[in-house]
Amino acid sequence: MAHKELKFNTEARQALERGVNKLADAVKVTLGPKGQYVVLDKKFGSPTITNDGVTIAREIELEDIFENQGAQLLKEVATKTNDVAGDGTTTATVLAQIIVREGLKNVAAGANPVILRNGIEKAVEKAVEAIREQAKEISGKDEIARVGAISARSEEVGNVIAEAIDKVGKDGVVNVEEGQTLGIDLEFTEGMQFDKGYLSPYFVTDQDRMEAVLEDPYILIANQKISNVQDLLPLLNQVMQANKPLLIIAEDVEGEALATLIVNKLRGTFQSCAVKAPGFGDRRKRMMEDIAILTGGEVITEELGLKLENTQLSQLGRARKVVVTKDDTTIVDGAGDPEQIKGRINQIKAELETTDSDFDREKLQERLAKLAGGVAVIKVGAATETELKEKKHRVEDALSATRAALEEGIVPGGGVALLKAQKAVGELLDELDGDERTGARIVYRALEEPIRQIAENAGADGSIVVDKVRAQGDSIGFNALTGGYEDLVAAGVIDPAMVTRSALQNAASIAGLLVTTDVVVAEPEEEQPAMPGGGMGGMM
């Protein structure tokens, strides 16, 4: 087993702090509307140019093994904030750096790290309460657009995101993809879509678009393979008498059952289309239940004692229209009971809150969106590959920020919400004493750091800006873009409360742990043996 290296006390803490500072200094130049960009080298392909804190943090590995541990801990702050809120990673990094710096300074001066950390935690709790109290709900397209525009530094992006969310609702799915044009386009799919197409091209009704379009169809949802036509005949007769098309969603449709459907379609006897059910295993069952609830039908399954040959029209789902291509099926305006659909949505939301798996969370989110209505796709294009990556990143961040704003509301941007939270922490200082008070004072000082950094990145004096904003009313702050002081909410400079809150909580969590560290254990880098020299082969 390889030996380990250790550092103790001040030496250990200083090494961690150097690592924290190196990462934070690389990230904080990007803060605010006049923040700069960072170029990231890639082993393969062109470099990435970005102003996204978490993307920069993820790329940083330091040579010194002890400093690197400090950098990796700070990286955790950015990553966690990104996971929870999707934005605010640079703010979180700036906050963590100042709490670590001030905390370690006080520990070196003799403060007890554990009591200090208690003070930090109490102050953060008060500040978070103050941020929540400042939050205002957002409604209307304009406010949604402003959140997106601030995050992406682009009004066009803000407007496209607002349009997408307006169409699919706040629970709907909005995907960001690479487009073929130079601008930003929005595509929208109404209704529920799943990624299974027709089982045979003979089902196509629109030859130009190669689509099977069924108007006002019945929908059979069967959790089984259908190959025996005798099982299907009683139901086919009922559907023919009703003079409506039929969509069959089953585990598979094959053999004579599939042949019968195709022959009847080609003869013009009656119109139908068969598709495979989406997903696999347990997830397939859940998705079939979703489709049944959306269309007002039942899942025909042997598990519940329901047999295909005994199925009645009343057990089938209905929809205004179904469009099937070779790759996917879209059900528009399912005839399900709105109350049942709402109940199912709430059930999925409850599952979302309890799941630990990112994969499950993504799949549940997809199911939720399909039930809640529609899928929007934002297609991002650019002149070069490098610009495309950067632009796509900004749109994804802006989308996350907008969702966070819809969830917990908005606060004044530009670091003002954090600065205003100082008042609540200031009141707490009177109740505390000793090292706890010192810990709370560290948070009090940290709350002004983001606004100071935004001002300095814009070429202004941070201390003067902080004093001026502190003396102002509610949401008056420094607009780094114009260089003036104004009502930031009215000017559209706003941040999601969730982003601001998460940035502070995650920064304090990691910084508090760093401050209480006394020993660092690290494994030295193994030296790679030199490559053997390639000499000439021997000759006879």
UniProtKB/Swiss-Prot annotation:
Q: What Gene Ontology molecular-function terms does this entry list?
A: ATP binding; ATP-dependent protein folding chaperone; isomerase activity; unfolded protein binding
Q: Which GO terms describe its biological process?
A: protein refolding
| Cellular localisation | Cytoplasm
Q: Any keyword Isomerase?
A: yes
Which cellular components does GO assign to this protein?
cytoplasm
Q: What class of enzyme is it?
A: isomerase
EC number from the UniProt entry: 5.6.1.7
Q: Where do the coiled-coil regions begin and end?
A: none
Q: Which InterPro entries match?
A: Cpn60/GroEL (IPR001844), Cpn60/GroEL/TCP-1 (IPR002423), GroEL-like_apical_dom_sf (IPR027409), GROEL-like_equatorial_sf (IPR027413), TCP-1-like_intermed_sf (IPR027410)
- Which reaction(s) does the protein catalyse, per the Swiss-Prot or TrEMBL entry? ATP + H2O + a folded polypeptide = ADP + phosphate + an unfolded polypeptide
Keywords for this protein: ATP-binding, Chaperone, Cytoplasm, Isomerase, Nucleotide-binding
Keyword Nucleotide-binding carried by entry: yes
Lineage: superkingdom: Bacteria
Q: What family does this chain come from, according to its entry?
A: Belongs to the chaperonin (HSP60) family.
Q: How does it assemble?
A: Forms a cylinder of 14 subunits composed of two heptameric rings stacked back-to-back. Interacts with the co-chaperonin GroES.
Role summary? Together with its co-chaperonin GroES, plays an essential role in assisting protein folding. The GroEL-GroES system forms a nano-cage that allows encapsulation of the non-native substrate proteins and provides a physical environment optimized to promote and accelerate protein folding.
**What name goes with this protein?**
Chaperonin GroEL
Q: Which organism is it from?
A: Rubrobacter xylanophilus (strain DSM 9941 / JCM 11954 / NBRC 16129 / PRD-1)
